[in-house]
Amino acid sequence: MTAPSQVLKIRRPDDWHVHLRDGDMLKTVVPYTSEIYGRAIVMPNLASPITTVDAAIAYRQRILDAVPAGHDFTPLMTCYLTDSLDADELERGFHEGVFTAAKLYPANATTNSSHGVTSVDAIMPVLERMEKLGMPLLVHGEVTHADVDIFDREARFIDTVMEPLRQRLTTLKVVFEHITTKDAAQYVRDGNDYLAATITPQHLMFNRNDMLVGGIRPHLYCLPILKRNIHQQALRELVASGFTRAFLGTDSAPHSRHRKETSCGCAGCFNAPSALGSYAAVFEEMNALAHFEAFCSLNGPQFYGLPVNTGWVELVRDEQQVPENIALADDSLVPFLAGETVRWSVKK
């Protein structure tokens, strides 16, 4: 029996789904991502969503201004799709290298999504343009109808929105983001090379019992919501299989402590500080460390048609405690796994 690895050396990873927010929050959270990842797909759901090239350029600069000296980090900007978005504006942003992808939020599916798309038909001309451009569509895959149970929203989305869309636009590149169900895992596995998925650390590590049994744990509350154990296991098996169209997307989504620990708390896990080590722990538990680098560093660039990062990151088997909180100007952030010990940490 061989001794377990003490060091994991991988190509520098990318985060294909992150929320960096704005203002003081942005300045606080950006370094946790820029220190580790070469690139990150930045979500556009600010209070005033990023729907124009100029807005994306300005936001990108605010992000870059928050990157500490010595960090080599490139934010990849996305356009927030709305019913009224101009396809020419989207194409201009893509050709000018401002927009890497566009994001489809069903209206009111998650934080700051009230401006989202009311129906796919409303944006079909934009999606047709994206298909011609080879521009990826990033999808929050949940229906938001009041009569659909929150635990069924993803599976229903596949049947009523995702599959009809992909039948209609057969060469549109689609990333099914933060998948949470065995239905989505099977759907992506059965799909063609134009369909990929991101998976978060929390959906690999936890299920809804972890959030709800023995007291409500608001810092595990995110959208899409944690599902049953059978769904968690399906996600773990997907990544452990070495499936090449699944890749790292933390969906790190910071909210101040008082907005999480309240009678009507916000959805989102701020997992940037511990995400890479969390993924490593899952792959180790699944005896799948041979596929860890591809998930973190190779599969995403392959799908997006981008080069693999040239640098390297080392994780060491060195137990460290995640901070209980991180200071904000007028509050604090409670990170994912706060106060808990993680067995893999990034070598500084």
UniProtKB/Swiss-Prot annotation:
Q: Which cysteines are joined by disulfide bonds?
A: none
Task: Report the gene name.
Answer: pyrC
Q: How does it assemble?
A: Homodimer.
Instruction: Kindly state one GO CC term assigned in the UniProt record.
Output: cytosol
**What GO MF annotations does this protein's record show?**
dihydroorotase activity; zinc ion binding
What is the species of this protein? Answer: Salmonella paratyphi C (strain RKS4594)
Entry function: Catalyzes the reversible cyclization of carbamoyl aspartate to dihydroorotate.
Q: Binding residues for substrate, per the UniProt record?
A: 19-21, 45, 140, 223, 255, 267
Top-rank taxon: Bacteria
Q: Which cofactor does it need?
A: Zn(2+)
**Active site (catalytic residues):** 251
What the entry lists under InterPro entries is as follows: Amidohydro-rel, DHOdimr, Dihydroorotase_CS, Metal_Hydrolase
Gene3D superfamilies, from UniProt? Metal-dependent hydrolases (3.20.20.140)
Question: Annotated pathway, please?
Answer: Pyrimidine metabolism; UMP biosynthesis via de novo pathway; (S)-dihydroorotate from bicarbonate: step 3/3
EC numbers on record? 3.5.2.3
Reaction(s) catalyzed by this protein?
(S)-dihydroorotate + H2O = N-carbamoyl-L-aspartate + H(+)
GO BP, one example? Answer: 'de novo' UMP biosynthetic process
Its protein name is Dihydroorotase
Q: Write down which residues bear the modification named N6-carboxylysine.
A: 103
List residues binding Zn(2+) 2.
103, 140, 178
